[in-house]
Amino acid sequence: VNARLAELTQKADCPFATAMVENGDYIVSKTMGAFSLVVLPKPGQDVKAVQTAMEELERAAQFGLTGTEIQRAKEEIYSAAEAAYNNRNKQQNSYYVPKYVRNFLENMPACDIETEFNLYKMLQQQLPAESFSATLKEFVASTDSNFVFLAMYPDKEGISVPTTDDFKAAVKAAKEAKLEAYVDNVKQEPLVPVLPKKGKIKKEEESLFGYKCWTLKNGARVFYRQTDFNESEVNVKAFSWGGSNKLADKDIANSKLFNMVFQSTGLGNFNATELQKKLAGKQASVNASLSAYSEGLSGSSTPKDLRTLFELIYLRFQTPANDPDAYNSLMTALRTTLANQEKVPETAFRDSIFATLYDHNARQTNLHVADLDKVNYDELRRIYSERFNAAGDFDFVFTGNFNVDTLRSYVEQYIAPLKAVKKRESITDLNIRPAKGIINNRFVRAMETPKATIARFYMGETPYSLKTAAVANALGQILTQRYLQSIREEGGLAYSVGAAASVSHDLRDEYAVQVFCPVKPAQMDSALLLMDQGINDIAEKGVTAEEIEKVVKYELKTFADNQKENAYWEGNITNYIRWNNNDVEGYEE
């Protein structure tokens, strides 16, 4: 049912931004269950949204669910359960804690993964397809005797709230509507209809951190490392210099929407809805992204779905699918979301931070409703084709549980045949720098509940080394602890305060120290004085041996834990490839 509702949202004229059903507690009650439909209407379409969502629920109850829908749902649940089962011996605390909480609060069985997986396999085989439709029909109320309707709105002037009779009429109209059975349109063709001729690996060599590197004939480089940290995980990351810095100023708005658009639209010959159905039961995804300096891909799969991962990589380097329905649906939803965000004082605060730090540079601003009027789907597709024109300009990183021979075969089949480049693009520096000098920006906005937020930034250039990076990291942690003591515990000025410090090495060697603290407006100046005092004390007197000991203990524990994380090694090899950084060797010393 949720898949049907999500499919409706891909249409630009859908009156709701999102809608979903769930079977669980009745609101906050732990002693009464309920089958619920939750609807988030688009502005001014509240009644229509309720009627449309209810009609879809009634359609499913009247005509039942199709066999292909049920099969896809089974495959989705099974593939997720299988991935958890395959990695059952390497679960972290975050997996176990919620289980025991539910066991204590709700008397839910705290089963191990193996038991859950075996139960699911048994139930999946025993439940006939018609039982799902029968259960749904029981869930959907046929009379008003067991039906509750709740509508919640902000208590603000100017908000138009439909009447109870309006909503009753919408529900009545949905129940009395003459509906037709849902048609499950499924595209049967392969993701990649015609396989390209295999390409070749030109060179093999060792790299850092246990990675090896294949240089392909088309110019692409593939770094790979086999691990057994997670039995069900293979990660991929790819990147090429270029990014939004290569775009003209007229494309700034397009660049801000790039990531969202191409994560929401289809691939190859499949629109977004068709692709979602095609990938049912597959634990594989690949997203494209555009940043200031580069464009890239990021994705993951299970070992079982590695071929699908490579098919998606291959499709990401083809002409992007023309999916105007998904694009228009996204734009409509964004107008609602951004309009609501712009009413919130915190949005103005975030905007002011960027405007202050980067002197109102248009490339360093957040997305606003006004930007949407400057975005053009055809231009976005043009930008995509330019930025992802040739895989030969990219470096790929694969980390996880895979067979090297299988990986080699897929690299030769899906990456090596892609377009080559004679010369790789170089990084483009637009000379966007933080504003210099001491700048104070204090502004006031009307708020129902008055509050203030302090954001402080200390930024500049300093030579990078592994030691300075470690020292900066320690500074942020120690500042946080000192501010918690002086501002929260002793001063009683705030519930929370946090600091972070870093030294980066990319185009320039820079440092940044940031402090955030929400306070009552009348106590803001007092908090600022304590902030100054805290950082000045460290500058003049240094830190204590006890503070250093705590940081070192925490960092060494984190470092040891990270040795078994695919994402940690992926991040470090990526940092090395892009910036020639080695933040692993010598870190403990």
Regions found by a protein language model. Name each.
Residues 126-131, 135, 322, 327, ...:
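Peptidyl-prolyl cis-trans isomerase
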Residues 323-329, 421-425, 543:
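Conserved short beta-strand edge segments in small beta-sheet-based binding/regulatory domains
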Residues 387-389:
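Conserved alpha/beta enzyme-core scaffolds, especially Rossmann-like or related mixed alpha/beta domains
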Residues 479-483:
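Short Ser/Thr-interspersed hydrophobic loop/turn segments at strand-loop and sheet-helix junctions
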